[in-house]
């Protein structure tokens, strides 16, 4: 192959498909260090709702970009791109293989491709008007507005993530071009010798796993975790737009019952999983591996390892 670019492994897939466990086993086999590809695991104190890996689950494998910000801090795709590219260099300099694991498609895409962010498309007045519209009409109203104007961007952004929805609308408003057009107009050259692995699963099985995961989160203390943030008056922040937090904030605000909030959380998680799969299938050259039970995990791990080793000529 004689590819002189830095090798990077990327493991993607929808929430609850089993990325965490497999990533640890692969990292050990590949002598890799893991970089989080999840937009919400960067926040401290948001562990249960983001299904953040525990130190015990890491089994000694170094992890990066987890617990680096307070919930009040903002964090952009450009910030992620810069941090991860630096981490990739650091890991490679240690003689290790960088591995990105997560499900935030736009974040991962921004790292892999020669994509630069522009600050030109800024209109604070428009942004403020959209924020007021979100507060008045609700997040779904704004997301529907984006879906009508830029379906591709809407598919990649969760309705709860008002900040990113407004940013996509702002780009359209100021430049006359969709976020998708901006991406397409830029060079789409891969900056790395990247092997993209995707985990998928039968939809009914995946949805059942998502429902079970939410139940387990509630049993593990998600409600008090969110209450701690609520009591600290952490509001109007990017972090609280995460699935699992916004739904329970509505409960603490007295707008919905707890059972309705949990049901909404399950529904939003299932919809997000569907959008994740759509994004990765349409936007990136991913090799997919089916994880639908019953599956021999040891055999599946060997199959994926062999694929990676072949691509990177290990």
Curated annotation (Swiss-Prot):
Organism ancestry: Bacteria, Bacillati, Bacillota, Bacilli, Bacillales
Similarity-based family: Belongs to the IPP transferase family.
Keywords: ATP-binding, Magnesium, Nucleotide-binding, Transferase, tRNA processing
Gene that this sequence comes from: miaA
Catalysed conversion reaction: adenosine(37) in tRNA + dimethylallyl diphosphate = N(6)-dimethylallyladenosine(37) in tRNA + diphosphate
Pfam families, A to Z: IPPT
InterPro entries the UniProt entry points to: Dimethylallyltransferase, IPT, P-loop_NTPase
Protein name: tRNA dimethylallyltransferase
Purpose of the protein: Catalyzes the transfer of a dimethylallyl group onto the adenine at position 37 in tRNAs that read codons beginning with uridine, leading to the formation of N6-(dimethylallyl)adenosine (i(6)A).
